[in-house]
Structure formats: C-alpha cells, structure tokens
C-alpha cells in the first residue's frame, strides 16, 4: 500500500483544468474503452486487474480514480487530482482550502461560457454545463475530490431531486 505524504499534495491549477476540460469537452455518451483512452491520454494508468480503476501520478500502485458504467456507457468518473494527507493539521487545512478556492476560480474562469448553472453545497460546488456534463468539486478534510457526471446521470439525478426521492446534500456531507 502506498504511504500517504504528511502534507497535502495537489496538481497545479493548469494541470487540474486540463483534466476537467478533457472530460467536460469529450463527446457523450462515452464507452468504457473511450474513458480508458481519455484517462491514459491524461497520464493515468489503467489498473490491469480491474479495468474501471486507474492510477494517478499521486499513487505508485494503488488505484485512486475510477469510472462507473452501465451497459458499457460511463455514468460518472472520480478523478484523482490530489493525494490525501495522513493527518489533519492547520497547515494542511489551509493548503486544501486555498487549492479548492483556486480550482473553483479556475473552473469559473476557463469554463465560464460552458456553465449553465452552479450550486454551492457545504464544502462542495457543482457546475452543470450546457452539454449536460456535471462537475462536482468537494473539499474534504484530507483532500479534494473531483467527480464528472455524464449528461445521462445528471438528468437522472435532477429528476430524482425534482421528485424528492433523495437529499443529495445530506449524502454529500457524509463524504
């Protein structure tokens, strides 16, 4: 198992937005093979025993990114853009907060013409793009989490919320 660094580590904002744009601008629906190709084009390595798992620069051997699929169509992707620290310290907390703010500002700046709506939840911001792709960035106690949701999953989640089937805010707070 890869040992966690004492300090929080994250991609610089230019690398972060390169990853976000690649996923946001990709055509949808996306097959699992296309997702693997996209991950690998961004420098992530496929995890041979489980093709839906991927390894970022932050991990030597352990998968830290993944896709979910249904009928060979990608539903969402969790993309590692940081490596969690092993302890919560004031320095790590400040660095995580600053990085999260920088990432949010970069999305707002670089994707401003693509954003249809945004929703701020506790320690989370969700941007829905005009193409239906959903970007969720979450500030956690030891790292930052990036999820990309396919247009199909974005539509399903919105329909569930409109029918009041679940409260995603409460679920996300537990992450």
What are these regions (language model features)?
Residues 1-121, 131-133, 140-175:
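Short helix/turn-capping signatures at newly exposed starts of structured segments
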